[in-house]
């Protein structure tokens, strides 16, 4: 589903290099210190940054040089990027048609997704008239209506309080199960990674430092857990 082979991007003349594969339907957490290259990795997959060399395949096709619109991915950022002058329903509809001219099937899709994320009664409200958690639900819904098989999450819930963050993680987990999404989720929170992904890729200085079970980072059994300030003794 996702294959990065010696994918290299030069940032201020320093190479960031990524090499790993993700199976269809697999959920991967991306962890690492601030500035390590986590968001860069997602932007390379999404097409907002173009790699200098290497190979990027999505769904078995090469996408290293294709535009974001032609890649089979949807991405959700920490900033929900909702347009303040459009209603929640219109913001979601942008995922279906940039001119908001929906046919009957698209309107049905929008309604179905709105029901799924709990926004049915809020479609006519402006973003300023709903809560932060509801705005992120709308941003997630805009991703879901696009029906792309790969979902990229770049710390979209980090600004939410713990209860709302857990609620959104539950929603993401259930939606991924239902739709068999392949997921890459950037996070600073190991507990969130444990909640979503059995496998974690740890990035340090633009390189993959660890690729393995999330549990081994949580319990300190992996040497790489020290990067996150975790040792076997501190996790006991």
UniProtKB/Swiss-Prot annotation:
This is Thiamine import ATP-binding protein ThiQ. Belongs to the ABC transporter superfamily. Thiamine importer (TC 3.A.1.19.1) family. It is a peripheral membrane protein. It is found in: Cell inner membrane. SUPFAM superfamilies: P-loop containing nucleoside triphosphate hydrolases (SSF52540). One of its GO terms (molecular function) is ATP hydrolysis activity. Its main location: membrane. The complex is composed of two ATP-binding proteins (ThiQ), two transmembrane proteins (ThiP) and a solute-binding protein (ThiB). Keywords: ATP-binding, Cell inner membrane, Cell membrane, Membrane, Nucleotide-binding, Translocase, Transport. Its EC number is 7.6.2.15. Residues 2-230 form the ABC transporter domain. It comes from the Bacteria. It comes from Pectobacterium atrosepticum (strain SCRI 1043 / ATCC BAA-672) (Erwinia carotovora subsp. atroseptica). The lineage of its organism: Bacteria, Pseudomonadati, Pseudomonadota, Gammaproteobacteria, Enterobacterales.
């Amino acid at each position: 589903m996702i294959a990065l082979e010696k994918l290299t991007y030069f940032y201020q003349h320093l190479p960031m290099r990524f090499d790993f594969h993700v199976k269809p339907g697999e959920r991967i957490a991306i962890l690492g210190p601030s500035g390590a290259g986590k968001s860069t990795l997602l932007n390379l997959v999404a097409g907002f940054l173009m790699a200098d060399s290497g190979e990027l395949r999505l769904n078995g096709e090469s996408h290293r040089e294709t535009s974001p619109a032609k890649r089979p991915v949807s991405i959700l950022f920490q900033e929900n990027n909702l347009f303040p002058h459009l209603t929640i329903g219109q913001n979601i509809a942008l995922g279906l048609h940039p001119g908001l001219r929906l046919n009957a099937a698209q309107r049905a899709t929008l309604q179905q997704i709105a029901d799924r994320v709990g926004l049915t009664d809020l479609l006519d409200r402006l973003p300023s008239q709903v809560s932060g958690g509801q705005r992120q639900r709308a941003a997630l819904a805009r991703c879901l209506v696009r029906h792309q098989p790969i979902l990229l999450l770049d710390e979209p819930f980090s600004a939410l309080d713990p209860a709302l963050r857990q609620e959104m993680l539950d929603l993401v987990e259930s939606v991924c199960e239902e739709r068999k999404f392949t997921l890459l989720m950037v996070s600073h929170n190991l507990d969130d990674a444990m909640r979503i992904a059995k496998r974690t890729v740890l990035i340090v200085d633009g390189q993959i430092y660890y690729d393995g079970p999330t549990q081994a980072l949580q319990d300190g059994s992996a040497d790489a857990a020290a990067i996150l300030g975790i040792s076997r003794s501190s996790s006991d």
